[in-house]
């Protein structure tokens, strides 16, 4: 039996964003539970699980899209961490953001670089902690 869209999406979300992605979905349960379900089913169950691009490529496209939209700090935070989770280097994330500069301008790129810096610093702090 084929997995449901929600099951496929939940697996993809966990693989990419770990606890951060689930925290976003959980934060919507009290006010807009359908929105959380749509994110899991559509974005992660239908789109992220398609053939043609691997998870690293999908995260780069997502980061570029979020940079162009502007005012997406929470989403950029989750997806930059997701990019690291699926094996992209910090340098690749920075290059993807810099690639947006000629098309969306310096203010949005600077803002995104600052989000990346915060995620990278947190990632470094987490990796310095002893593992249980």
Predicted feature locations:
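Acidic, glycine/proline-rich low-complexity segments that act as flexible tails and inter-domain linkers
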Residues: 1-56, 85, 109-132
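A general alpha-helix detector
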Residues: 12, 43, 78-79, 96
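Short acidic alpha-helix initiation/capping motifs at coil-to-helix transition points
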Residues: 37-40, 70-76
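Short, structured motif recognition centered on aromatic/hydrophobic residues
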Residues: 58-66, 96-97
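Short alpha-helix boundary/capping elements
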Residues: 65-72, 105
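C-terminal structural segments of small proteins and small subunits
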Residues: 101-107
């Amino acid at each position: 039996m084929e997995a449901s869209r929600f099951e496929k999406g939940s697996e993809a979300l966990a693989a990419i964003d770990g606890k951060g992605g689930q925290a976003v979905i959980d934060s919507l349960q009290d006010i807009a539970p359908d929105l959380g379900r749509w994110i899991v089913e559509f974005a992660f169950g239908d789109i992220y699980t398609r053939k043609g691009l691997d998870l690293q490529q999908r995260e780069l496209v997502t980061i570029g899209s979020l940079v162009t939209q502007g005012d997406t700090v929470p989403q950029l935070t989750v997806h930059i961490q997701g990019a690291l989770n699926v094996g992209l280097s910090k340098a690749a994330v920075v290059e993807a953001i810099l690639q947006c500069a000629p098309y969306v301008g310096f203010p949005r790129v600077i803002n995104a670089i600052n989000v990346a810096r915060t995620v990278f610093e947190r990632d470094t702090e987490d990796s310095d902690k002893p593992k249980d």
